[in-house]
Amino acid sequence: MPELPEVEITKRGLVPLIINQEVSRVILHRENLRWAIPKNLITILANQKIKTIKRRAKYLLIKFEAGTLIIHLGMSGSIKVVDIKTPLLKHEHFELQFNNGTSMRLNDPRRFGAVLFSKDGSHKLLDSLGVEPLEAVFNNGYLYQKSRNKRKNIKDFIMDSKIVVGVGNIYACESLFMASINPQRKAGNVSKTRYKILTQCIKDILTQAIKAGGTTLQDFSQVDGNPGYFTQTLSVYGCENKTCHFCKSKIIKIVQNQRSTFYCRKCQT
């Protein structure tokens, strides 16, 4: 699933290709993804220029004079910008064509993504989001303060988008391994010192993943079509029964809240 690094990489790849481009045509190759795609986008975005593109959590916010296009990549989505004459691929469900002869296409095989629109840039899906992990507000004391009296496990806690956004399953596993914290430990039982270490580990893991172009496990690709290379540096995620880099014991897999969790029982306490 595209997580914060993959969405950030997508945003950075789109900036030089679509900023200031004028939409000549909007095509809905299917009427719905996770939710219905607004049909009035065909008229609302016609002849509109793209002013900015930003990321909030795992959402892409594409700003026009008329409002903001909100895109979520879902479980399997990716975006590419291609020549307008390029043959349409099977799972390319939404398309913005530009006057310069290029086309931005959303590919979403599993159709859990979303294409939404807001006139003022606000949306109920954005209203309850927590802080951005790569911004200064996500500081050494933030997680500790939020975790007091929390009984949920630490992994589910840092994956809660109302607490901090964008720390998906892959990066939660990797961050907890780097911080030597057992993913089953209760969030309220983690010390302030360990939260300080975990906060920096989350920042470091996400930054490394962005530099590597994200993680490609199955469907994700960058705007230029290349895969993300952070997959090659994963320490625990997807590494069941492989050897821990540090203690040489086996990485184990458990299930937490219907998600696979990978960790080292010896290194993570």
From Swiss-Prot:
MF GO annotations: 8-oxo-7,8-dihydroguanine DNA N-glycosylase activity; class I DNA-(apurinic or apyrimidinic site) endonuclease activity; damaged DNA binding; zinc ion binding
Highest taxon of the lineage: Bacteria
Pfam families documented for this protein: Fapy_DNA_glyco, H2TH
Key words of the record: DNA damage, DNA repair, DNA-binding, Glycosidase, Hydrolase, Lyase, Metal-binding, Multifunctional enzyme, Zinc, Zinc-finger
Residues of the active site: P2, E3, K58, R259
GO terms, biological process: base-excision repair
Cofactors (names): Zn(2+)
Cofactor-binding details, from the entry: Binds 1 zinc ion per subunit.
Family recorded in the similarity comment: Belongs to the FPG family.
Function: Involved in base excision repair of DNA damaged by oxidation or by mutagenic agents. Acts as a DNA glycosylase that recognizes and removes damaged bases. Has a preference for oxidized purines, such as 7,8-dihydro-8-oxoguanine (8-oxoG). Has AP (apurinic/apyrimidinic) lyase activity and introduces nicks in the DNA strand. Cleaves the DNA backbone by beta-delta elimination to generate a single-strand break at the site of the removed base with both 3'- and 5'-phosphates.
Subunit field text: Monomer.
Entry protein name: Formamidopyrimidine-DNA glycosylase
Lineage, highest ranks first: Bacteria, Pseudomonadati, Pseudomonadota, Gammaproteobacteria, Candidatus Pseudothioglobaceae
Gene name for this UniProt entry: mutM
